[in-house]
């Protein structure tokens, strides 16, 4: 007889009725499983006197099947789901559809769009679904393997940092973005203002290919209307699962979920946010330098093989490819006009029309001439009006 499949079941402590129902389901699965399955929940881990996050992650490491209940988009459960996906675990998601908003909230949770769930009404219904669908029979059919196998690109585009911006551009968010931009660390930025519907494959690929992640959360009051913190908790779990360095920052007042309380720093002011991030980035720069040296040593003597399946298709946002865009940029009439213009030229166009791509290629081309000194000025949104006002002020030639 084959060894039983180990299942770890993640669920929230509240509301108590939901927690109780799931614990009864765990007991019934163990009783009726005929030795095929051993299921246990987080309350059985025995975390007294231990770091909870280590015990939870160890339990996920040891299981073959990860079951999570997303009736409520609980940040602890979402963090654990991200960790399980990164560790290539078979996932079975459940939803108590008797809760009025459960299905609607799940459908609106864009990062899991396309990932199915088992909808149940009570403990009997859930246990019956478990033995009917038999998720323990195909533990190798994982979300991670399906995403990686269906990816358009198998080239590992290594990045130093994945940065998940705050949904609202608060002063701490503006100052943190400036700090990261000035650090010189190659960064992939997930900006909700640019694109708030990146697919799960994008997050898995970019988290896997980054050394670290900075995740900036809103306080509960400002996140309530358009929830973003749940998705960010999930991505933090992905980053943890890929063994990345993770810094989570949150605007005050923010109640820290137990799972990632050790990764989180709640800031009252912008200065506190920037100070914490700057210290963390200093350590990250040293780590990236060391990893770069290791990679060069590994690559010595290795012949580069070019294959069509390794073709890198690039990012849909030019800001994420400042360093690589110049390698595949196709010159356009607008680009050539900008190089030949006598004094100045203004690009006008909607998002995605190529304004930033042209800017980077123009700067790179002009910078290749040692007679030129190129300076890119990219004001954040709130500074733009000030720049326009400055242009209207009469200044002496020296001041100009």
Model-based region annotation:
Residues 1-305:
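Conserved catalytic or regulatory cores that recognize and/or transform ribose-phosphate-containing ligands
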Residues 297-382, 387-390:
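Walker A/P-loop-proximal flanking segment of P-loop NTPase domains
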Residues 392-400:
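Conserved nucleotide-sensing/catalytic segment adjacent to the nucleotide-binding pocket
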